[in-house]
Design a protein with these regions (language model features):
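Structural and coupling elements of P-loop NTPases
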Residues: 1-282
Length: 282
């Protein structure tokens, strides 16, 4: 569904590599094993890292096939958050549920990235409804497409900004149009309900019909992700590198830091205090 391509896009856009590899060419950073290159799939978990907004982001790329669930569990156990990549055409698959269950078992905050929104058969709205139905009201739309396919526009529902993308993944802001606001309105209720669940103050504002400010929304998103009460949904195209800037911004600004995890469970099932050292990472 695009995990390796997403990792490759992050490496390229952050400047970590100057040439973006492709799975079909067998030259991606994360699929370095000859067997992976031959089959065109990930077999084992691999580690890469990028620097973004003064934050070191460690990226653990895991296999998507159900037969390699052990690799997923091992990676999630040491991760601070889990980005679950979902195909905008086919929606929830077995691997989606396995990744969700693994992250839940280890108490790791979860984020969805709906990939392949550049495909003409993409249906973000259907996939979002599937996620909402399957995984509950913690699912929170943050970055959504207005159009899908080759001519795509994406909306940041927190900042209420619209973006276009070029062939190299670069984005630029465009004016908000009435039709963009109409699309945003379709997801705003789900967004505000999830944000309101992070504090009594926001819940009171929500039930009173008052607008949640952008500043309040940004803080609530950060706190909700850490607490596990919000599972944000982003979207884009890993191969086109669309939406990847927004995801990296979120990782650097809203995702939990290693210091957020205070304890770990040892083999005997006993909680052990942990004290992460070193530079700020995500």
């Amino acid at each position: 569904c695009g995990k390796t391509s997403l990792a490759e896009a992050m490496l390229y856009l952050s400047g970590k590599i100057d040439r973006r590899g492709k799975i079909a060419d067998g030259n991606t950073v994360c699929d370095f094993d000859p067997e992976e290159q031959k089959r065109g799939i990930s077999i084992s978990a691999s580690l890469a890292h990028v620097e973004w907004k003064e934050t070191k982001i460690n990226v653990l790329d895991t296999p998507g096939y159900p037969g390699f669930t052990g690799e997923v569990s091992q990676a999630v156990r040491v991760a601070d958050s889990a980005i679950i990549v979902v195909d905008a055409r086919s929606g929830i698959q077995v691997g989606t549920e396995l990744a969700w269950d693994a992250a839940t078992a280890y108490g790791v905050p979860k984020v969805f990235f709906v990939n392949k929104c550049d495909d003409n058969e993409a249906n973000f709205d259907r996939v979002f409804k599937e996620l909402d139905y399957k995984f509950g009201r913690t699912v929170c739309p943050v970055f959504v497409p207005v159009e899908q396919g080759k001519d795509i526009t994406m909306l940041d529902l927190i900042a209420m900004k619209a973006y276009k993308y070029d062939s190299r993944g670069k984005r630029w802001e465009i004016p908000m149009e009435d039709r963009f606001n109409e699309v945003a309105a379709q997801y705003k209720d789900a967004l505000n309900e999830a944000l309101a669940g992070t504090s009594d103050e926001l819940m009171e504002k929500y039930f009173a019909g008052e607008e949640i400010s952008r500043e309040e929304a940004a803080i609530a998103l950060h706190e909700g992700i850490i607490a596990g009460s919000i599972t944000p949904v982003y979207c884009g195209s890993a191969t086109k590198m669309w939406g990847v800037y927004a995801l990296m911004d979120a990782i650097a600004e809203s995702f939990p830091r290693p210091t957020a995890r205070k304890t770990e469970t040892d083999p005997a099932g006993k909680a052990v205090a942990i004290e992460p050292d070193g530079a700020d990472t995500a």
